[in-house]
Amino acid sequence: MKYTIVPANTPEQDRFVSISDFKECMHWGGEVEFIWKGTRYGAVRYVQGNRISVCGANRQETERFYDTADEALEYMVGEDRLRDVITKVEVRFRSI
């Protein structure tokens, strides 16, 4: 039996090149972990309820739920709006 090993993406391949890129990722149920100004965040679309959760990693009190990716882009990452920095964040993991 022959196996194919698929290499991991590079950071450049994982980054969001546009706001639409992030929206599409969330539309298809993507899961994202990213760093902005030294703080780790996560965004995921849950199947149950079909809502998007965004929060600081391991900080449940910062979790907010949104119905659309446009709404999720209004989440504040520190003092910045996610919409303004999504193409600049350091993506650590991206499922889609």
Q: Where do the protein language model's features map onto the residues?
A:
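A short, sequence-level motif marking secondary-structure junctions
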Residues: 17, 44-51, 69-73
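A general marker of short, structured functional hotspots
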Residues: 12, 18, 32, 37, ...
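Amphipathic, interaction-prone secondary-structure segments
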Residues: 24-57
